[in-house]
Amino acid sequence: MSKQIIYPGAVIGIIGGGQLGKMMAVSAKQMGYKVAVVDPVKDSPCGQVADVEITAHYNDREAIRKLAEISDIITYEFENIDYDALHWLKDHAYLPQGSELLLITQNRETEKKAIQSAGCEVAPYSIVKTKNELKQAVQELRLPAVLKTCRGGYDGKGQFVIKEEAQMEQAAALLEHGTCILESWVSFKMELSVIVVRSVNGEISTFPTAENIHHNNILFQSIVPARVEKGIQQKAADLAVKLADELNLVGPLAVEMFLTEDGELLVNELAPRPHNSGHYTLDLCETSQFEQHIRAVCGLPLGKTDLLKPGMMVNLLGDEVKLVEEDPELLKEAKLYIYGKHEIKKGRKMGHITFMKQPEDEWIQEITNKWMNRDGGQAE
């Protein structure tokens, strides 16, 4: 891989035009880069701020070829991209992140094996392809357990929590979508995540460990710093660095973990891109995850990631985006981000708010109650 420096003024091509691409593009443009984007939706969030918008599917080879022609460097905002298209790009354009890590993280089986090969712990699991294999796996792992499709699925899609044997038949419907993975249910104390970024030159940095709270399998809140001992925070960061080095990472990697009741950290999922749980970095850290992404892939020195002040990020799902209209006082000590999606849907990530003050139990509960009264719901 060439370790060239891509200087401001160059064109950065982004595959994917959602909110992650938009915030990436804004950071790139602030640094003096131009941006081109490919997305199936015209006037996508990223398309609204890009210099060039190509409206086409991600695996449209002609669109990918056009993006390569006009861009000095290519990156992406999410992992479920056509591998063949990315592999073609690797040979015909400058794709510093490569395609191999995406291939690993597109499949939960290969992802689990890669995590274990790096020397990190995961919850006990079994790969299942048939109903008989599912039955056998349940006998070995015991219930409750979570059945997930190996490919696809996000924000709670493509998974089923099996609490009792009577639900086996219902869960088995997931097998129609292909190979699945059955994971033991982890009784965890807390969910944590660390965003680690590694540059083309091997320079590495981590952002502060975030505490994540999910509702309906969708991220609801990220609290920083996580309300755990500093030793646990450091252990989480060390795990992320270990994975980044073992996987030969270029760019950002979100490492989601369970903190068990006995203080162990189990790696749950990886995402080789900017991550929802890292949105707090836009306002609470010296450098955001999006700017760090641009620095890393362009070969620039990484920025400092110190936490400037504690706070909490809360997602705006569906019509929760209207909460600000109903109570403008929410923004008194907060920053608002609206992504620019044209249609409000139940469970759709429409924006987020970052509260810039010390997260205390009482006001965290106040915010939680306000959101729960509206309940943006699970993604459709």
UniProtKB/Swiss-Prot annotation:
Top enzyme class: ligase
InterPro entries per UniProt: ATP-grasp (IPR011761), ATP-grasp_carboxylate-amine (IPR003135), ATP_grasp_subdomain_1 (IPR013815), PreATP-grasp_dom_sf (IPR016185), PurK (IPR005875), PurK_C (IPR040686), PurT/PurK_preATP-grasp (IPR054350), Rudment_hybrid_motif (IPR011054)
Molecular function per GO: 5-(carboxyamino)imidazole ribonucleotide synthase activity; ATP binding; metal ion binding; phosphoribosylaminoimidazole carboxylase activity
Source organism, top-level taxon: Bacteria
EC number: 6.3.4.18
Species for this entry: Bacillus subtilis (strain 168)
Alphabetized UniProt keyword annotations: ATP-binding, Ligase, Nucleotide-binding, Purine biosynthesis
A GO biological-process term: 'de novo' IMP biosynthetic process
Function: Catalyzes the ATP-dependent conversion of 5-aminoimidazole ribonucleotide (AIR) and HCO(3)(-) to N5-carboxyaminoimidazole ribonucleotide (N5-CAIR).
Family matches, as NCBIfam families: PRK06019.1-1, PRK06019.1-2, PRK06019.1-5, purK
Catalytic reaction equation(s): 5-amino-1-(5-phospho-beta-D-ribosyl)imidazole + hydrogencarbonate + ATP = 5-carboxyamino-1-(5-phospho-D-ribosyl)imidazole + ADP + phosphate + 2 H(+)
GO cellular component: cytosol
Complexes and interactors: Homodimer.
Record family assignment: Belongs to the PurK/PurT family.
Domain named ATP-grasp: residues: 112-298
Binding residue positions for ATP: 108, 148, 153-159, 183-186, 191, 214, 268-269
Pathway field: Purine metabolism; IMP biosynthesis via de novo pathway; 5-amino-1-(5-phospho-D-ribosyl)imidazole-4-carboxylate from 5-amino-1-(5-phospho-D-ribosyl)imidazole (N5-CAIR route): step 1/2
Any matching Pfam family: PurK_C
The protein's name in its UniProt record: N5-carboxyaminoimidazole ribonucleotide synthase
Disulfide bonds: none
